[in-house]
Amino acid sequence: MKQANLLFHKFIDLLAKNEGRTCSVKKYAEELCITPKYLSFISKSVSGKTALEWIHEYTVKAIERYLKHSNLSIKEIADRLGFPNLSFFGKFTKNYLGVSPTEYRRQQSMKKEVLEVHTKV
Protein backbone atom coordinates (compact mmCIF):
# COMPACT_ATOMS: atom_id res chain seq x y z
CA MET A 1 0.00 0.00 0.00
CA LYS A 2 3.01 2.27 0.49
CA GLN A 3 3.68 2.11 -3.26
CA ALA A 4 0.05 3.03 -3.97
CA ASN A 5 0.30 6.10 -1.72
CA LEU A 6 3.50 7.17 -3.43
CA LEU A 7 1.98 6.78 -6.90
CA PHE A 8 -1.17 8.61 -5.84
CA HIS A 9 0.86 11.57 -4.55
CA LYS A 10 2.89 11.63 -7.77
CA PHE A 11 -0.41 11.71 -9.67
CA ILE A 12 -1.63 14.67 -7.59
CA ASP A 13 1.70 16.43 -8.21
CA LEU A 14 1.23 15.94 -11.96
CA LEU A 15 -2.28 17.37 -11.73
CA ALA A 16 -0.98 20.44 -9.93
CA LYS A 17 1.84 20.93 -12.46
CA ASN A 18 -0.63 20.72 -15.35
CA GLU A 19 -2.59 23.61 -13.79
CA GLY A 20 -5.99 22.18 -14.60
CA ARG A 21 -5.34 21.22 -18.22
CA THR A 22 -7.82 18.56 -19.13
CA CYS A 23 -5.93 15.35 -19.85
CA SER A 24 -6.95 11.72 -19.95
CA VAL A 25 -6.39 9.17 -17.22
CA LYS A 26 -4.35 7.31 -19.83
CA LYS A 27 -1.93 10.24 -20.21
CA TYR A 28 -1.30 10.46 -16.46
CA ALA A 29 -0.96 6.69 -16.19
CA GLU A 30 1.63 6.70 -18.98
CA GLU A 31 3.62 9.39 -17.16
CA LEU A 32 3.58 7.20 -14.04
CA CYS A 33 4.40 4.04 -16.04
CA ILE A 34 1.24 2.24 -14.90
CA THR A 35 -2.06 1.30 -16.55
CA PRO A 36 -5.06 3.63 -16.46
CA LYS A 37 -7.02 0.94 -14.63
CA TYR A 38 -4.37 0.69 -11.91
CA LEU A 39 -4.20 4.49 -11.57
CA SER A 40 -7.95 4.63 -11.03
CA PHE A 41 -7.74 1.72 -8.58
CA ILE A 42 -5.04 3.31 -6.42
CA SER A 43 -6.72 6.70 -6.60
CA LYS A 44 -10.01 5.25 -5.41
CA SER A 45 -8.41 3.13 -2.69
CA VAL A 46 -6.21 5.96 -1.33
CA SER A 47 -8.62 8.90 -1.66
CA GLY A 48 -12.11 7.57 -2.30
CA LYS A 49 -12.19 9.36 -5.69
CA THR A 50 -11.36 7.97 -9.12
CA ALA A 51 -8.52 9.43 -11.16
CA LEU A 52 -11.05 11.02 -13.52
CA GLU A 53 -12.83 12.68 -10.60
CA TRP A 54 -9.50 14.17 -9.50
CA ILE A 55 -8.73 15.38 -13.02
CA HIS A 56 -12.14 17.02 -13.27
CA GLU A 57 -11.78 18.61 -9.83
CA TYR A 58 -8.49 20.25 -10.80
CA THR A 59 -9.95 21.37 -14.13
CA VAL A 60 -13.01 22.91 -12.45
CA LYS A 61 -10.78 24.81 -10.00
CA ALA A 62 -8.75 26.16 -12.92
CA ILE A 63 -11.92 27.19 -14.77
CA GLU A 64 -13.19 29.03 -11.70
CA ARG A 65 -9.83 30.76 -11.22
CA TYR A 66 -9.64 31.91 -14.85
CA LEU A 67 -13.25 33.07 -14.98
CA LYS A 68 -12.96 34.99 -11.69
CA HIS A 69 -9.48 36.45 -11.96
CA SER A 70 -8.50 36.84 -15.61
CA ASN A 71 -9.58 38.87 -18.59
CA LEU A 72 -9.02 35.94 -20.95
CA SER A 73 -11.88 35.24 -23.33
CA ILE A 74 -13.91 32.08 -22.86
CA LYS A 75 -12.22 30.65 -25.97
CA GLU A 76 -8.75 31.46 -24.61
CA ILE A 77 -9.58 29.71 -21.34
CA ALA A 78 -10.93 26.66 -23.17
CA ASP A 79 -7.79 26.54 -25.33
CA ARG A 80 -5.45 27.02 -22.39
CA LEU A 81 -7.11 24.16 -20.51
CA GLY A 82 -6.99 21.84 -23.51
CA PHE A 83 -10.67 21.56 -24.38
CA PRO A 84 -11.26 20.44 -27.98
CA ASN A 85 -13.87 23.14 -28.64
CA LEU A 86 -16.05 25.80 -27.02
CA SER A 87 -19.13 23.61 -27.04
CA PHE A 88 -17.47 20.91 -24.96
CA PHE A 89 -16.00 23.53 -22.62
CA GLY A 90 -19.44 25.10 -22.14
CA LYS A 91 -21.10 21.75 -21.43
CA PHE A 92 -18.34 20.73 -19.01
CA THR A 93 -18.59 24.04 -17.15
CA LYS A 94 -22.37 23.94 -16.98
CA ASN A 95 -22.26 20.34 -15.74
CA TYR A 96 -19.85 21.16 -12.89
CA LEU A 97 -20.70 24.79 -12.05
CA GLY A 98 -24.39 24.75 -12.92
CA VAL A 99 -24.17 27.66 -15.37
CA SER A 100 -22.40 28.56 -18.60
CA PRO A 101 -18.89 30.06 -18.43
CA THR A 102 -20.25 33.48 -19.41
CA GLU A 103 -22.96 33.36 -16.75
CA TYR A 104 -20.49 32.17 -14.10
CA ARG A 105 -18.16 35.07 -14.91
CA ARG A 106 -21.07 37.52 -14.78
CA GLN A 107 -22.21 36.18 -11.39
CA GLN A 108 -18.69 36.41 -9.97
CA SER A 109 -18.31 39.94 -11.30
CA MET A 110 -21.57 40.96 -9.61
CA LYS A 111 -20.45 39.40 -6.31
CA LYS A 112 -17.17 41.29 -6.54
CA GLU A 113 -18.99 44.59 -7.17
CA VAL A 114 -21.27 44.01 -4.18
CA LEU A 115 -18.27 43.30 -1.95
CA GLU A 116 -16.52 46.44 -3.17
CA VAL A 117 -19.60 48.57 -2.43
CA HIS A 118 -19.90 47.10 1.08
CA THR A 119 -16.23 47.66 1.87
CA LYS A 120 -16.43 51.32 0.79
CA VAL A 121 -19.40 52.03 3.06
What does each model-found stretch correspond to?
Residues 22, 26-58, 78-103:
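Basic/polar phosphate-binding segments, predominantly the helix-turn-helix DNA-binding elements
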Residues 10-24, 43, 47, 64-73, ...:
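Basic, amphipathic alpha-helical hairpins
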Residues 1-15, 19-20, 33-36:
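Polybasic "coupling" helices that flank or enter modular domains
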Residues 45-84, 106-121:
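Terminal helix-turn-helix DNA-binding modules in bacterial transcription factors
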